[in-house]
Amino acid sequence: ALIDYFRKYGDKYDIDWLLMAAQGYQESRLDHAARSAVGAIGVMQVMPATGKDLGVGDITEVEANIHAGIKYMRWMMDHYYGDEPMTKLDKALFAFASYNAGAGRISQLRKEAAKRGLDPNVWFHNVEFVVADRIGSETVTYVGNIYKYYIAYHLLIEARDEREQAREKMKNLNEGAP
């Protein structure tokens, strides 16, 4: 299932798999049949040329598509933000913004954020304000949606785990009852 691929490649590339699943949801609603007007393919909406460059196999296959999307995000995080004094989450958020608006543009806007007295290494309530001001809401909405889906996925996983723990406790209580 999709979750297994997100876990596998999230682990391989040291990126929170829930964050990548959230990006997949933003890109395609996790629909591997999705195709964009510009030719992006699958769950992660990978362009064929990018998929070929990444060397992960046939991106028309769901596993290779998810592999490509996660590998590409890891490359963006390392290439553009690897040496930046940011949290892992901010590196991912800036990589998403760069994916959406272009790394050069985001780099310029980080510098502008610093000039405005904002933290150029923090996305939320800092660089996102400059991005919204200079290029509009699309990138801010894109990154914000991914983060909202990420939080929702986290809450769902926590609730599931709590239910399983409660069931196990009830089972143990029932087994110990006379």
Name every feature range the model reports, one short phrase each.
Residues 1-178:
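Catalytic glycan-binding domains that act on GlcNAc-containing polysaccharides
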